[in-house]
From Swiss-Prot:
Organism of derivation: Streptomyces griseus subsp. griseus (strain JCM 4626 / CBS 651.72 / NBRC 13350 / KCC S-0626 / ISP 5235)
PROSITE patterns: RIBOSOMAL_L14 (PS00049)
Segments passing through the bilayer: none
UniProt xrefs under Gene3D superfamilies: Ribosomal protein L14
Protein name: Large ribosomal subunit protein uL14
């Protein structure tokens, strides 16, 4: 469960290392976001020479959460960290590589480019 002011690790090679959630997209009163949800965030930590700089406002999709999520078959999925992938305006990932596993929920939300770049889909 990601909400305003939540900090997430960035799971791609855009140059950002950590982002801070500004807003959860999807309705005016929406408070929490899970795997596959889009957020607006600001870059808090970045490496020199990357595509994004500290202070940039970006859109990102959540790919891993510590809070478990119940699936349709009754199983639960959870990860060791909260992580996101930075997006372009058209919804494609800004980076060219994805690090670590991603949730299967991204397939249902039509983030096929992220699914194809990810090393593992759980």
């Amino acid at each position: 469960m990601i909400q305003q002011e939540s900090r997430l690790r960035v799971a791609d090679n855009t140059g950002a290392k950590e982002i801070l959630t500004i807003r959860v997209l999807g309705g005016s009163g929406r408070r929490y976001a899970g795997i596959g949800d889009v957020i607006v965030a600001t870059v808090k930590d970045a490496i020199p020479g990357g595509n994004v700089k500290k202070g940039d406002v970006v859109k990102a999709v959540i790919v891993r959460t510590v809070k478990e999520r119940r699936r349709q078959d009754g199983s639960y999925i959870r990860f060791d960290e909260n992580a996101a992938v930075i997006l372009k305006n058209d919804g494609d990932p800004r980076g060219t590589r994805i690090f670590g596993p991603v949730g299967r929920e991204l397939r249902e939300k039509k983030f096929m480019k992220i699914i194809s770049l990810a090393p593992e889909v759980l």
